């Protein structure tokens, strides 16, 4: 098996130019959305590779967080608003924090004294 020789930065830069590769600067996070969850990659290294008229994005490094997507209906938000006497954003946040559980969201809001 051949051992790969390390490349110096100048050679690497030349190779990246030949392959039409470049690194995106200032990327804070990448979110991959799936039907039931999201994967959030913080502080990733993102490289764009152009080949045959297409762009490919390579994502590396960073810390990864996975969270479930909760679909909250407008009716649920309105119900929590009415029952707990709170504004739209407060009701929505409570539902998100409780995984969409209406009763739990209302109880949390009324027990905490939020008006």
Swiss-Prot record:
Keywords: Protein transport, RNA-binding, Transport. GO terms for molecular function: RNA binding. It holds the Pfam family NAC. GO terms for biological process: protein transport. Residues 6-72 form the NAC-A/B domain. Homodimer. Interacts with the ribosome. Binds ribosomal RNA. Belongs to the NAC-alpha family. Contacts the emerging nascent chain on the ribosome. This is Nascent polypeptide-associated complex protein. It comes from Pyrococcus horikoshii (strain ATCC 700860 / DSM 12428 / JCM 9974 / NBRC 100139 / OT-3). The lineage of its organism: Archaea, Methanobacteriati, Methanobacteriota, Thermococci, Thermococcales.
């Amino acid at each position: 098996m051949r051992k790969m020789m390390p490349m110096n930065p100048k050679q690497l830069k030349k190779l990246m130019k030949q392959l039409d590769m470049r690194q995106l600067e200032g990327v804070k996070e990448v979110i991959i959305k799936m039907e039931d969850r999201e994967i959030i990659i913080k502080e990733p290294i993102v490289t764009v590779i152009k080949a045959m008229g297409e762009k490919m994005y390579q994502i590396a490094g960073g810390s990864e967080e996975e969270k479930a997507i909760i679909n909250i209906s407008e009716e649920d938000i309105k119900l929590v608003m009415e029952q707990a006497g709170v504004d739209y954003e407060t009701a929505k946040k409570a539902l998100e924090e409780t995984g969409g559980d209406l009763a739990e969201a209302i109880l949390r809001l009324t027990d905490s004294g939020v008006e």
